[in-house]
Amino acid sequence: MTVTEIARAEGTGKGVDRNAGRGGGSTRRLLPSLARLRLVSGLVLFAFVLTHLLNHALGLVSIAVMDVVQTWRWTIWRSAPGTVLLYGAFVVHIALGVRSLFRRRTWRMPVNDALQIGLGFAIPVLLVGHVLGTRGMHIAAGVDDFYEPVLRRLWPEAVSQSLLVVIVWGHACIGLYHWLRPKPWFPAVAPWLLSAGTALPLLALAGWIEAARRLELLDHGREVPRWPNGETAALAGWLAEVGNQLVFAFMGAVGLGLIAVRVATRLRAKVRISYGGGRLVRARPGPTLLEISRMN
């Protein structure tokens, strides 16, 4: 059977079944459900990031307005259902993202896919410290995490915090693009979405930076509480260390998993695929026909 015939059979669900006798039918039924779950979890995270950046953009108005909207956001995301939904979506999205990475049999891919994967792995490195330093300290020590004290704490880390905004938003927009691109109405709204997707992070960066600079000017020459102080410094240091260990453990586990998958794939027997013109390719089971074609 040629590669064209195999592709046609796979596309129609007839003919070749590489998973026959190995629970292939149940696997194929499971994959769409996992894809939908990954999509839904991504949309939940996108909604959180969207409202968070809109809140940052209000720094162009005033810190007081930022805090008012922040309170509204907390009503949703810090409620018990909102917390379960948000952190559940975070765990599910990461788990399914790592799963899809383990299933990949070649690193030859479109630029968009490579960029999304790279940004996705950069997010935990910058995000864990941000979350533990804000909500983590609020839960553990009751540290005020309204905008004024948070801006004071984050302003010395302006570069990394700004980079976090760009990375998270970039990863989210690439995922949203992959989801919306097949929609028949997408070409008509694409220019508007591109404009909004470009403007929002710029406004968010301008908003939080302007608010932090304005606060720095107001603090000049007056006594203001600094953080971490003697009471919270030890806890902040411990949380930072825990965050670093979590990131290293996650990256190490993913790296070892990828190595294990690669070794297992190489140990499996090869199959033959014939192309038009008489070209014959030997490949190990696992990759899709498209991935095999890219590798050869």
Model-inferred region functions:
Residues K270-M295:
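Membrane-cytosol interface motif
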